């Protein structure tokens, strides 16, 4: 089980990312625009605006965690669970449609 503080920190990052998502996306779109190119000074202003946003609002700082244990590694996106929890749940027949492989 992961520490509660780490799980809360991750939730806080998710909220920040959702809050600043539109601002970040529109700023990046304006900087990269080929249709109406910005001057160099306008681009630097937009870049400064991006840099003024909180670091934890960047989507790259988010980390997928296990739904039950909060474990940050070996997560399966389809289930939102870490590998060993997924395995235990499949063995206990708690996940519909998931079966053990045998050959």
Curated annotation (Swiss-Prot):
Compartment(s) of residence: Plastid, Chloroplast
Keyword Transferase part of the UniProt annotation: no
Main location: plastid
InterPro entries: Ribosomal_uS14, Ribosomal_uS14_bac/plastid, Ribosomal_uS14_CS
Gene3D superfamilies on file: 1.10.287.1480
Region (Disordered): 27-56
GO biological process, one term: translation
GO MF terms held by the record: rRNA binding; structural constituent of ribosome
Entry keyword Disulfide bond: no
SUPFAM superfamilies linked to this entry: Glucocorticoid receptor-like (DNA-binding domain)
Reported function: Binds 16S rRNA, required for the assembly of 30S particles.
Family recorded in the similarity comment: Belongs to the universal ribosomal protein uS14 family.
Subunit text: Part of the 30S ribosomal subunit.
Name this protein carries in UniProt: Small ribosomal subunit protein uS14c
Gene source species: Zea mays (Maize)
